[in-house]
Design a protein with these regions (language model features):
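Alpha-helical scaffolding within the catalytic cores
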Residues: 37-39, 61-71, 99-103, 165-169, ...
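N-terminal module-boundary/linker segments of secreted carbohydrate-active enzymes
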Residues: 24-85, 90, 94-95, 344-353
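Aromatic- and acid-rich polysaccharide-binding/catalytic face
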Residues: 82, 241-262, 303-305
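Substrate-binding cleft of extracellular glycoside hydrolase catalytic domains
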Residues: 90-221
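Substrate-binding cleft of secreted/luminal carbohydrate-active enzymes
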Residues: 51-56, 277-361
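Aromatic-lined carbohydrate-recognition surfaces of secreted/lumenal glycan-active proteins
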Residues: 54-56, 183-185, 208, 212-239, ...
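Loop/turn elements at helix/coil->beta-strand transitions in domains of secreted/extracellular proteins
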Residues: 48-51, 75-78, 110-115, 175-181, ...
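Bacterial N-terminal signal peptides
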Residues: 7-18
Length: 366
């Protein structure tokens, strides 16, 4: 508890000196690490005031698309999105890229980025590696789903072994004191992933709760903040979001993926469900324009999907967003200062030497 207060005080002092209101908040995991608690408090402090720019990267490409954002704008995203993948060989989604991805996440955190991680989990009836449509976008029968949620059943045990592999990677980040916005079973109100499209208490939300229990109570992954995620009902076969909510006690952040227009109704609906929790755009294709943030100010971060930053957005829009006054990139003192305060407090708590400040937006290696 003393350690937690140490990091909290460091962040609170920085925010107070910067003129930002310090928002105390409690993670859903009562044993959350000091760094996870401080990150959640920071997200609450910027809610309604600023939005962190974020960029997704496939597991086997390093920081390619984060570097592309810098090439396009001269600014690094403030949030780095990694992925655990599902395929094999040299594919961009290859599971062989996981060890390097974890090391890249550590580097990005040291350099001042917030971290979020996604996992396109394979069906528990399959073995990695798989193809996207053959497993991730395939389905389970109702009988298989029931068995998956039955403790001790053969399929439940296969699922445990499957998720325990990912827990091992997340433990490396826990031991490195890296807080992670973890977004499991994303877009669960849609029917395009095997885990999605099952509303109600024994549906997709039950699987999310089962994973929470495994990661928190068995593996003690206390560095995770839990970012529950749904897809916007933008003409797709996505169900009513409330029917997929696991409960306020399982979500630190309430997030929505939007590919298309940023309809004000989506924002209103997610706010109504989130209450005082921070909200986020878990994935986007087309970037939200600066005007969107004027009418939808409570988005605390967005994450653009990999190559879409270059191939799906006009250069003028990308630069307008990254240079908007309410958008936080890695070099912005409103983001860089608080995250540096968290890392400094961690180092002092552990008795480590102070870290060297990273160079300001170094050009990525070619």
């Amino acid at each position: 508890m003393r350690m937690m207060r140490f990091v909290f005080i460091a962040l609170a002092e920085f925010l107070a000196c910067s003129g930002w209101l310090y928002a105390a908040s409690e993670p859903v995991n009562p044993h959350a690490t000091p760094e996870a608690r401080a990150l959640l408090a920071y997200l609450n402090s910027i809610s309604g005031k600023a939005t962190i720019a974020g960029q997704h990267n496939y597991p086997n490409v390093g920081a390619r698309w984060t570097d592309m954002a810098y090439d396009l704008t001269g600014k690094y995203p403030g949030l780095f999105g990694g992925d655990f993948g599902f395929s094999g060989g040299e594919d961009k989604d290859s599971v062989l890229g996981r060890p390097a991805m974890i090391e890249e996440v550590k580097r990005q955190y040291r350099n001042g980025a917030v971290i979020t991680l996604t996992w396109h989990e394979v069906r528990p009836i399959d073995d990695e590696p798989v193809t996207f449509k053959g497993s991730v976008q395939n389905h389970l029968t109702d009988a298989e789903w029931k068995e998956l949620l039955t403790p001790g059943s053969p399929l439940n045990q296969r699922w445990q072994a499957q998720v325990d592999v990912i827990a091992g990677y997340l433990q490396q980040l826990r031991d490195a004191h890296v807080p992670v916005l973890f977004r499991p079973y994303h877009e669960m109100n849609g029917s395009w992933f095997w885990w999605g499209g099952r509303p109600g208490k024994d549906g997709s939300a039950a699987l999310y709760r089962q994973l929470y229990d495994r990661f928190v109570n068995v593996h003690h992954l206390d560095n995770l903040l839990w970012a529950w995620n749904v897809n916007a009902p933008n003409g797709s076969n996505a169900g009513v979001i409330e029917a997929y909510y696991p409960g306020a006690e399982y979500a630190d952040v309430v997030s929505m993926d939007i590919y298309g227009e940023f309809n004000q109704e989506y924002y209103t609906n997610i706010l109504a469900l989130a209450g005082d929790k921070p909200i986020a755009l878990g994935e986007v294709g087309k970037l939200p324009s600066p005007e969107v943030f004027q009418t939808q100010p409570r988005w605390t971060y967005f994450m653009d999907w990999s190559e879409i930053i270059q191939r799906g957005n006009p250069l003028e829009l990308v630069n307008a967003v990254y240079h908007a006054p309410q958008v936080l990139t890695r070099d912005d003192p409103r983001l860089a200062g608080p995250l540096a305060a968290i890392r400094k407090a961690t180092a002092e708590r552990l008795g480590a030497a102070p870290e060297a400040a990273p160079a300001a937006n170094p050009a990525p290696a070619q």
